[in-house]
Amino acid sequence: MLANFKRPFFQYVKKAHKPLKLAIEDEVEVVCARPEIGELKVGDLAGIRVQKFRFNRHEYLIAYRPPAKDAPLEFLIIDFYQVGVHENFYDALKKYLRNEKQTGETP
């Protein structure tokens, strides 16, 4: 399964230290292998799943949208939206999704 990294995800990983980058990479591989593993969100974040993992005594979250179940095999792409600690995570994610929708990009 292919991974598509959105700007907030890419920027966070770019600024992270190498051990955290490796931990994030491991979690991305887990999610790509089993996209249904994360917790499904409802309401404003409907369709988004969040995978939690611990690193260095902190809990990190990865927000992603798995492909549709009826998607053709060549379109099995997981969109990774954001990664970070819990503080303001959901507020920032909602803001990004709202701005993405207003600019006309496909979520």
What role is predicted for each listed range?
Residues M1-E27, P107:
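Arg/Lys-rich, positively charged N-terminal/basic patches that mediate binding to nucleic acids
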Residues M1, R49-Q51, I62:
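Residue-level detector of beta-strand structural context in well-folded domains
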